[in-house]
C-alpha cells in the first residue's frame, strides 16, 4: 500500500466508499465535520441493518440474530468513539439512542441473548458520554431518559432506561429532580397501581420508596428527616 501513488490510493478509496455505504459513513465520521445530514445517514444505516437481517414481517430469526446484533455493535464501536473524540457528544448520544430503539423494538429470536449484549453496549456508551458532558448536556440527557421511561422499547429493556436515570446522574440539581420524579411515581402507585394483592405493583412501590430514601441519604438529609419519611411507609416490611 505504501507504494501506491497517493492520487491512485484516493481514487481506490473513493470508488470503494461510493459502493459501500457503511465504509462511506465510517470515513465521513472520522474525517469530515458531523452535519445533520451525516447523522441522518448513520441512522439510516441502523434501519438498513434491521431490514437486511429480518424477513418480510420484520422478524430476525435464529440463524440471522447473531449477525444482526454483531452489526449493530460494530456500528456503535466504529462510530461512537470517533464522535466523542471530535467532541460531538450529543450526536453520539443520538446514535446510541437510535440503536437502542432498533434493538428494543425488533422482533427477534433472542435465544443467544444478543439483544442484551447490544443493550449493555448502549448502556456503557451512555455512561461514557455522560462522563464527558457539560452541565447543559447532562440536563438534556436527564430529560431524554425521563421522557422515555415508558412505551419506548419492549418492557424489559425499559429497565435499562430507568436504571440509568436513577443510578447515573449525581449532580445535586439532577438528584433533586430525581427525588421529585420518584415522589410523582409513588403518588401514582398509591392512586392507581398499588394493590396488596399485586406482587409487581407492591414491589414497584417498595423499590421506589427505597430508592427515594437512598437519594435522601446522597443529598445529606438528616437522620431525623429520613426517619420521618420511613415512618410514612411503615406498613411495608421492607422499609
Could you describe each region identified by the protein language model?
Residues 1-239:
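Eukaryote-biased, non-catalytic alpha-solenoid scaffold regions
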Amino acid at each position: 500500500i505504501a507504494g501506491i501513488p497517493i492520487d491512485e490510493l484516493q481514487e481506490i478509496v473513493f470508488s470503494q466508499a461510493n459502493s459501500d455505504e457503511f465504509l462511506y459513513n465510517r470515513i465521513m465520521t472520522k474525517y469530515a465535520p458531523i452535519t445533520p445530514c451525516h447523522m441522518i445517514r448513520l441512522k439510516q444505516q441502523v434501519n438498513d441493518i434491521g431490514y437486511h437481517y429480518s424477513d418480510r414481517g420484520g422478524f430476525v430469526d435464529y440463524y440471522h440474530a447473531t449477525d444482526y446484533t454483531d452489526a449493530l455493535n460494530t456500528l456503535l464501536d466504529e462510530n461512537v468513539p470517533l464522535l466523542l473524540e471530535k467532541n460531538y457528544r450529543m450526536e453520539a448520544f443520538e446514535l446510541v439512542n437510535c440503536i437502542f430503539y432498533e434493538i428494543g423494538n425488533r422482533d427477534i429470536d433472542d435465544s443467544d441473548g444478543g439483544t442484551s449484549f447490544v443493550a449493555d453496549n448502549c448502556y456503557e456508551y451512555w455512561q461514557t458520554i455522560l462522563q464527558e458532558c457539560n452541565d447543559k448536556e447532562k440536563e438534556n440527557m436527564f430529560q431524554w431518559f425521563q421522557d422515555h421511561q415508558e412505551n419506548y422499547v419492549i418492557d424489559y429493556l425499559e429497565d435499562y432506561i430507568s436504571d440509568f436515570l436513577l443510578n447515573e446522574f449525581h449532580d445535586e440539581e439532577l438528584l433533586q429532580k430525581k427525588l421529585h420524579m420518584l415522589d410523582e411515581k409513588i403518588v401514582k402507585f398509591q392512586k392507581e397501581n398499588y394493590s396488596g394483592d399485586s406482587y409487581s405493583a407492591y414491589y414497584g412501590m417498595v423499590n421506589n420508596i427505597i430508592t427515594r430514601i437512598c437519594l435522601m441519604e446522597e443529598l445529606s438529609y438528616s437522620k431525623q428527616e429520613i426517619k420521618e419519611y420511613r415512618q410514612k411507609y411503615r406498613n411495608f416490611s421492607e422499609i
